[in-house]
Amino acid sequence: MTKNSNHDENEFISFEPNQNTKIRFEDADEDEVAEGSGVAGEETPQDESMFDAGESADTAEVTDDTTSADYYFDSYSHFGIHEEMLKDVVRTKTYQNVIYQNKFLIKDKIVLDVGAGTGILSLFCAKAGAAHVYAVECSQMADMAKEIVKANGFSDVITVLKGKIEEIELPTPKVDVIISEWMGYFLLFENMLDSVLYARDKWLVEGGVVLPDKASLHLTAIEDSEYKEDKIEFWNSVYGFDMSCIKKKAMMEPLVDTVDQNQIVTDSRLLKTMDISKMSSGDASFTAPFKLVAQRNDYIHALVAYFDVSFTMCHKLLGFSTGPKSRATHWKQTVLYLEDVLTICEGETITGTMSVSPNKKNPRDIDIKLSYSLNGQHCKISRTQHYKMR
């Protein structure tokens, strides 16, 4: 289902959600001014760029808490995932611009980098004049981060601590700034946000800064007959055999892929806004209403979720979007295929609710409940579907 974006890789279009706050979305070298979004359920104009039972407790599968944690951290020991993130210019350059263009947030401050990986954010902070940076990384990449810090001459400024943020002891009672790239697919996959909130509550001084401090989740609907036929309907006849029993399971697995903006059929709606500096851990579990209005006559095969992130403490508000009309990121978008093909006419609406919560067995996974209805001229339907991101 991977599609090619119509705009040049260096082209960025303004994003205009409904809010009075101006946000300048950053890419590699170009700046665009846009407006942020605020209220769940309100229309968010398409992101026109910058701103993805019954098992035993002793099972050997990743559903066991200890095993799942080990699996999660081990996955970040591989160089490939760090290469992908570092080469994500939207992601990495935005953080760099936030730090370098707003040194007043970092200079002479004690900084905590949660989930430091290779230490790139810590290096940015050290170069921007941080008094000291504590880079916490649980995976084996922590050993490489120490070498990277030493190779770049910042051993006296950056201390790499290997371990879980919930288990390590910082050599300082408080920090002035917490920085982290905690976002996963669908914003919340891998549940690293909880670690950031833990660090905030334990170490951040009153009035301290969290970077980024705002995130929002959005929803739209797309036509995607070709890919759904290839990936879902495929199970109806496999070399002449009926394997349709797999379809329901396949439908429950959200697809992370890049969506062509030409596939978009409806407007986009804000599902959830999170203030990382104030929210509690439980706020990441939510039920939000939505109303998607068709922009043309077409078929709908899936709903698509994406997220935006912003840094509101900067001189000029910075951030980025992972939506279909933005420059592609390694997060891509999250596609939720519908059991039925919806025939919709321009102006008709799909209404419903989406419930999101961590999986009870493995809190790094996400359970999604989607209820939707369409009362249109050619299609009348009301259905509830369940999805599991893992």
From Swiss-Prot:
UniProt-annotated catalytic positions: 181, 190
Main location: nucleus
Listed name of the protein: Protein arginine N-methyltransferase 1.1
Membrane-spanning parts: none
Phenotype reported upon loss of the gene: Reduced levels of proteins with asymmetrically dimethylated arginines. Altered leaf morphology and development (curled leaves), multiple rosettes with an increased number of leaves, delayed flowering, disturbed inflorescence morphology, increased sterility.
Coiled coil: none
Record-linked Pfam families: Methyltransf_25 (PF13649), PRMT_C (PF22528)
Location(s) in or outside the cell: Nucleus; Cytoplasm
GO process terms (BP): chromatin organization; methylation
GO cellular component terms, semicolon-separated: cytoplasm; nucleus
Family listed: Belongs to the class I-like SAM-binding methyltransferase superfamily. Protein arginine N-methyltransferase family.
Region (Disordered): 1-59
Organism: Arabidopsis thaliana
InterPro entries listed in its UniProt record: Arg_MeTrfase, Methyltransf_25, PRMT_dom, SAM-dependent_MTases_sf
Transcription regulation as UniProt keyword: yes
Role: Methylates (mono and asymmetric dimethylation) the guanidino nitrogens of arginyl residues present in a glycine and arginine-rich domain. Type I arginine methyltransferase active on both histones and non-histone proteins. Required for leaves and flowers development. Mediates the methylation of MBD7 and MED36A.
Subunit structure: Interacts with PRMT12, MBD7 and FIB2.
Domain SAM-dependent MTase PRMT-type: 69-390
Molecular function GO terms recorded: protein-arginine N-methyltransferase activity; protein-arginine omega-N asymmetric methyltransferase activity
